[in-house]
Amino acid sequence: MRHDGRRPDELRPLAFRRRYTRPPAGSVLVRMGRTTVLCTCSVELTVPPFLVGTGKGWLTAEYAMLPGSTSPRKPRDRAGKIDGRSVEIQRLIGRSLRAVLELEKLGERTLWIDCDVLEADGGTRTAAINGAYVALIDALTSSSALFPPVGQVVRGSVAAVSVGLLGNEELLDLDYEEDKEAEVDLNLVMTGAGQFIEVQGSGEEATFSRSQLDRLLKLGKLGIDAITAKQRDALGASWPLA
């Protein structure tokens, strides 16, 4: 039994609150346990210079932790002084969502994903990806005058979860207390169809075997399936896949 009473293979409580703010085309507040992230998707009618004249669109992401999301306070990211971790995570979010997008179907438009962490208790990057996918679908749906039907633009779903080894036990969806003590920590990004988008993993003063890696990947897949089901429930009739 884990310190919060969960089973080793149990996710933290997960909830998506859609249309959380009005200005963006898509806006979702996602909670995974105490970790809370506001994910928005905005449409810009231009593309980066390298895509001008190609007829192809783009998706990019920004990620930040608000100063009060942690204790002690985290200094705010500023232009010219962006946390290297934030840069890594926002690139991960962008790559993850582009993996299931038909960018040619967007026309010369950019989808901006913004993920702001309101409270951090481990797994902020995975929560951000999970919420960003829901915000993306809402943005495409609410901007139907600009884009083809969502099912033609999006070819799969995206979900992310952490897994780790703590005391030689495989755990799903680590919170901060578990993450800081874990001997091995992996972040998985997968499609709902079970295809890998990204695997990030490392030992923390420890090594792990191929059989342990295989078990962690299997455990992560169980988590991805459960998260995908929650995304489907949250989107309801807006779910883009057959």
Summary of predicted features, one role per range:
Residues 1-242:
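Polyanion-binding surfaces on beta-sheet-dominated domains and ring/shell assemblies
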